[in-house]
């Protein structure tokens, strides 16, 4: 009876469209996300102009305050808000509506996140937390900054548990069925988030008493290691969110089918199981780890490239099949048959193309010797503006063109489509300039996280100026892109004509093989992930704790 | 059969001299990475042996009990500090390690597991986590160096590795009690 009621509920949900209360939750998340993007982007522009020597920042809002806010707002807050909003809408659509309890958890998580952001931003503006988004000790921020971080993590936890509850309840009601693929991605992404947040939670709980002055010293290396177990993982979570849209929605948009349900689920499992120990590739130059250990972590880190390569294979196979179905001939004829003038395809497609150089750069810099050349230079900033600032963010933008009209029961107009194409091109060109310049000038030695200086007119430093000028041009284009995108999002939300927009979910091929049952064994995968994490972390952590030097007192370098 | 080929590749890779040298240079990697990988290589190769010698398995391991006992004996043997030392200093023992872990632990484990009753599986989970817990205590608490080849701090590291392994197995076991897989299928 219960089951029958629920299938009816799901059917009505699919034909009538989204549940109004679920839509309100997601729209709230997305509105705040794009407001945050606007602020973060404006700060980015200020940084770009400063670095080119075109703009001097006032003392009361200096470069490092802005940089901290830019990093936290964009890499942590914008992405988190987007992920929760997008996945809650996905659950609502594919599982027949959110459970009332889970919807409430979504609102609680929102409250926690907003509280956290208020704490963090206030302390940054007051000039008491210019510690960058990595908040490495022994630099010490106000304790309220760290307390804000606790709220942010708590928000992630509450929203994640909500996802698990909704998925488990669906599974109970639908015995023998596989969780729909998009919800499966949501579960995987939140499992990875929770696993990744364990280390940083421990770190922040050590930093808070230190920041209040209750403990005198802090173990610097331990903190950095715990931070990167999170920092690395969370970026891969954002990537997984983007990948979910590539697998599930993009094939539908181009009139193709799902390539392989099993392969997609395998990618999720591999991402969850292998990811967390990858954090060490951010510490290749750190002292305190033996050479042999660092060498072994190169493999750990490269193994994460495996699911990415599988994804690339999968996507190109889908494109080729879709193109051939439309009558494409020859080796590359399918390429022309793709709907290039549809922004819902163009944006994620450019996102995927950007991942080719981005992934190659990542594989390069995870090698010890190559890392020494680019470590802490602007190269690294160029790298993650490609991976995160382009691959992930452009995919998020691409989702907006159908998700918002779907939620508000409106339709995207051809005008907005055209504007979206312009936005995508502006973003791509802006990033080409900014990230390209950052990569190049980084190899020439220009450091990251350093406001404009010529080092007393040193010749080498002066030689960076032309590249930094290109960086500023790219940054200005990007800010134009931000303005366009924010305009598009709010236009779609409030002014687009009423109508019906579908939530694009690709169907499997007619002759698709059945998905094996082992993909649903989350109990096993979580345990395997914990085992892999302990294999990666036990050795260095025990060493860092047992052989620790005396801890460090706090420093305020700004 | 593809699996068996992967298993063989992994097996050979693990025995390459630079790989063994690196893996054995760190105590925790020696015991918690190299040795389990040998077992996994054996598990991957199992289908090959099952196809080649079907009678052997049905005759000697019909209910899975002999296989799992053999597995436990081999695993216990390699958990002793002394055997690790000998593997490093006596070539014959090193070769025994290369043979015993895949073929006398990995193969019987995979052949037995499907045949075992739930009750026996539960006993295995509990005893493995208990043994690992004991090893954790031994390696963390021992004031003496237990292996000639490894320092005390490495020993403690290994002990903490055992804490996590014991916890993993135990949590998995608890999870099987509470989450009935068939309920979700
Ligand atoms: C208008 C667009 C953007 C511009 C102009 C911009 C520009 C910059 C610049 C100039 C830096 C500082 C380089 C340094 O001194 O080290 C920076 C850092 C950074 N950006 Fe952006 N960016 C933009 C968008 C984004 C986006 C969309 C993201 C991520 C979603 C992002 C994430 C970051 C992060 C994480 C840092 C590092 C902060 C740190 O080193 O602590 N940025 N950005
Ligand atoms: Cu990383």
Task: Describe the role of every protein-language-model region.
Chain B
Residues 1-185:
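Alpha-helical membrane segments of multi-pass proteins
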């Amino acid at each position: 009876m219960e089951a029958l009621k629920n299938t009816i509920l799901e059917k009505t949900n699919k034909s009538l469209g989204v549940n109004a209360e679920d839509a309100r939750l997601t729209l709230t998340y997305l509105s705040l996300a794009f407001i945050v993007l606007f602020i973060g982007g404006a700060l980015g522009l200020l940084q770009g102009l400063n670095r080119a020597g075109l703009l001097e920042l006032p003392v009361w809002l200096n470069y490092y305050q802005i940089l901290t806010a830019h990093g936290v707002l964009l890499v942590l807050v914008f992405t988190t808000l987007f992920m929760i909003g997008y996945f809650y809408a996905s659950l609502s659509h594919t599982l027949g509506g959110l459970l009332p309890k889970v919807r409430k958890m979504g609102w609680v998580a929102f409250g926690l996140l907003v509280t956290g952001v208020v704490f963090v931003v206030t302390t940054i503006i007051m000039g008491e937390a210019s510690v960058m988004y990595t908040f490495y000790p022994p630099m010490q921020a106000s304790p309220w900054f760290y307390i804000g971080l606790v709220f942010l993590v708590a928000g992630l936890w509450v929203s994640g548990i909500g996802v698990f509850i909704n998925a488990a309840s669906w599974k109970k009601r639908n015995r023998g069925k596989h969780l729909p693929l998009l919800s499966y991605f949501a579960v995987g992404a939140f499992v990875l988030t929770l696993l990744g947040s364990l280390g940083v939670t421990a770190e922040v709980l050590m930093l808070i008493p230190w920041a209040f002055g209750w403990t005198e010293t802090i173990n610097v290396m331990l903190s950095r290691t715990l931070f990167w177990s999170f920092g690395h993982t969370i970026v891969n979570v954002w990537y997984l969110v983007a990948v979910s849209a590539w697998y599930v929605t993009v094939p539908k948009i181009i009139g193709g089918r799902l390539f392989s349900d099993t392969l997609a689920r395998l990618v999720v499992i591999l991402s969850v199981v292998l990811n967390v120990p990858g954090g060490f590739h951010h510490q290749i130059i750190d002292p305190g780890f033996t050479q042999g250990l660092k060498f072994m972590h190169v493999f750990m880190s490269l193994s994460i490239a495996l699911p990415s390569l599988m994804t690339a294979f999968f996507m190109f196979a889908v494109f080729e099949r879709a193109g051939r179905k439309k009558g494409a001939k020859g080796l590359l004829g399918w390429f022309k048959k793709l709907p290039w003038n549809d922004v819902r395809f163009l944006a994620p497609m450019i996102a995927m193309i950007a991942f080719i150089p981005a992934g190659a750069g990542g594989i390069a810099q995870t090698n010890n010797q190559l890392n020494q050349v680019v470590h802490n230079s602007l190269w690294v900033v160029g790298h993650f503006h490609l991976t995160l600032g382009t691959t992930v963010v452009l995919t998020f933008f691409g989702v907006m063109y159908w998700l918002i009209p779907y939620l508000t029961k409106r339709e995207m107009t051809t005008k907005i489509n055209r504007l979206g194409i312009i936005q995508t091109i502006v973003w791509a060109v802006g990033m080409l300039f900014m990230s390209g310049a950052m990569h190049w000038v980084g190899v020439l030695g220009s450091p990251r996280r350093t406001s404009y200086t010529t080092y007393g007119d040193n010749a080498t430093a002066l030689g960076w100026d032309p590249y930094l000028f290109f960086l500023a041009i790219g940054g200005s284009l990007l800010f134009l892109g931000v303005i366009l995108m924010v305009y598009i999002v709010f236009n779609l939300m409030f002014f687009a004509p009423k109508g019906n927009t579908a939530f694009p979910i690709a169907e499997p091929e007619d002759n698709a093989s059945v998905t094996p049952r082992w993909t649903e064994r989350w109990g096993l995968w979580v345990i395997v992930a914990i085992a892999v994490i302990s294999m990666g972390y036990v050795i260095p952590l025990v060493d860092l704790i047992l052989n620790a030097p005396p801890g460090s007192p706090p420093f305020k370098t700004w | 059969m593809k699996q068996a080929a992967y298993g063989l590749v992994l097996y050979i890779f693990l025995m390459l001299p630079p790989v063994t040298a690196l893996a054995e240079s760190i105590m925790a990697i020696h015991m918690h990475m190299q040795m389990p990988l040998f077992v996994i290589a054996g598990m991957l190769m199992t289908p090959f042996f099952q196809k080649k010698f079907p009678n052997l398995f049905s005759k000697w391991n019909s209910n899975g009990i002999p296989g799992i006992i053999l597995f436990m004996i081999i695993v216990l043997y390699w958990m002793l500090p002394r055997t690790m030392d000998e593997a490093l200093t006596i070539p014959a023992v090193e070769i025994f390690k290369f043979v015993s872990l895949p073929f006398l632990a990995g193969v019987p484990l995979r052949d037995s597991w499907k045949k075992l009753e739930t009750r026996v599986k539960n006993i295995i989970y509990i005893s493995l986590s208990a043994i690992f817990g004991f090893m954790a205590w031994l390696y963390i608490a021992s004031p003496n160096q237990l292996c000639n080849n490894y320092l005390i701090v490495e020993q403690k590291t290994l002990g903490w590795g055992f804490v996590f392994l014991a916890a993993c197995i135990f949590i998995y076991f608890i999870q099987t009690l509470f989450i009935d897989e068939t309920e979700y299928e």
